[in-house]
Amino acid sequence: MIRVAINGYGRIGRSILRALYESGKRQQIQIVAINELAKPEAIVHLTQYDTTHGRFQPRVKLVDDQMLIGDDVIKILHEPDPAKLPWREMDIDIVYEATGAILDRNSCEAHIHAGAKQVLISHPSSADVDGTIVYGVNQDLLRAEHTVVSNASCTTNCIVPVIDVLDKHFGVKSGAITTIHSAMNDQQVIDAYHDDLRRTRAAGQSIIPVDTKLARGIERILPHMKDKFEAISVRVPTINVTAIDLSVTLDKTVDIATVNQVLELAANGRFNGILGYTDEPLVSCDFNHDPRSSIVDGTQTRVSAGQLVKLLLWCDNEWGFANRMLDTSLAMIAAKQS
C-alpha cells in the first residue's frame, strides 16, 4: 500500500482524492494526510459537495483534526512550511504537491527533508526536477533514484499523446495550438486587481487571453519537437472542460478518414484509457468528469492540401489530470521497486 499526502487541497487536490475512490485505486494508494491552510469544516464540506463534479458518494465526517471517509482516517494539517510537516513520522511514500506554488526542485526537497520519499508536482515545473511525465507517453523514463517529478499540465497531457501518434504515423513538421480553457481560480468574479491586466476582468463576462508555456511543455516530453510548435491560450466563461484546437503540418499526405482511423485505433490500443475518440455531436459539458487525458472529436477533423491537419481535442482539465496523478505515482513506485 502506497502512503501518500496531499499538500494543497484545492481543485486538483480534491479531485485527486475523489478520483482515488472512484477509480478503484484505493486498494493500492492510501491518503494519510492533507496539508491545507483552510478551515477543517471547509475542507470536509468541499470534499463532500462539489459544484463541478457533484456529491461525493462516500460519507465524509470531521472528527477533531481528522477527516473520515468510511473507515479511512485522514489527518488534516495546517502547516505553511513544508519542511516542518510530519512526513517521516507518517511514513509518507509520495507527496502530491498541489499548491501550485512549489514548482522547483529546491522547494520540493523540503518535503524530502521532512521525510517523504518522493514528490509528484501537479503542475509544470522547473527543468531541474528528475523528470516531467505525461502518462502513456514517457513514464518508462522513471527511475528508482527519481525523487522529484512533475506531472506536466492538463493541456500537455491532452495534446502530447495525439502529437505522438501523428508523428509516429505521418511525421510532424510543425504545429500551432489554441487552448480554449475554462476559467480558473486565479481570475476574478468581478473586476479586481491582478498583476496580469487581462485577469483583472470578470471571468464570467469575457473570453480572456492568457500566457501559456504549452509549446515548451511539448518539447520537454518530445525533445525532437523543439521549436516546431507555438501556442496561445484563452479562458472562457465555463467552470470546467477544455478544448484544444491543434493544427499540424505533416510529412505525409493524408485525408480525414485516414487521420481519424489512426487516432481511433490508438485510443483503442496503446492509449486505451488515456486517449479517447468520438464521432458524436457532443459539447464541452459532455466531457465533464471524463477520466481520460484527451478525447479526439472526429467530427471536427479537417485536412487542407493533404498535409495541413486541424483537430479538436477535449479534456476535463481537472478530472483527467487528477487520474493521471494517480497513474504517475503508481509508476513512480513501480520504478523505485524495480
Swiss-Prot record:
Its main location: cytoplasm. The keyword Disulfide bond does not apply. It is found in: Cytoplasm. It holds the Pfam family Gp_dh_N. Signal peptide: none annotated. Its EC number is 1.2.1.72. The active site is at 154 (nucleophile). Transmembrane segments: none annotated. CDD domains: GAPDH_C_E4PDH, GAPDH_N_E4PDH. Substrate binds at residues 153-155, 199, 212-213, 235. GO terms for molecular function: erythrose-4-phosphate dehydrogenase activity; NAD binding. One of its GO terms (biological process) is pyridoxine biosynthetic process. It is an enzyme of class 1 (oxidoreductase). It comes from the Bacteria. It catalyses: D-erythrose 4-phosphate + NAD(+) + H2O = 4-phospho-D-erythronate + NADH + 2 H(+). Keywords: Cytoplasm, NAD, Oxidoreductase, Pyridoxine biosynthesis. The record marks 181 as: Activates thiol group during catalysis. The keyword Oxidoreductase applies. Disulfide bonds: none annotated. Homotetramer. NCBIfam families: E4PD_g-proteo, PRK13535.1. Belongs to the glyceraldehyde-3-phosphate dehydrogenase family. Epd subfamily. Catalyzes the NAD-dependent conversion of D-erythrose 4-phosphate to 4-phosphoerythronate. This is D-erythrose-4-phosphate dehydrogenase. The lineage of its organism: Bacteria, Pseudomonadati, Pseudomonadota, Gammaproteobacteria, Alteromonadales. The gene is epd.
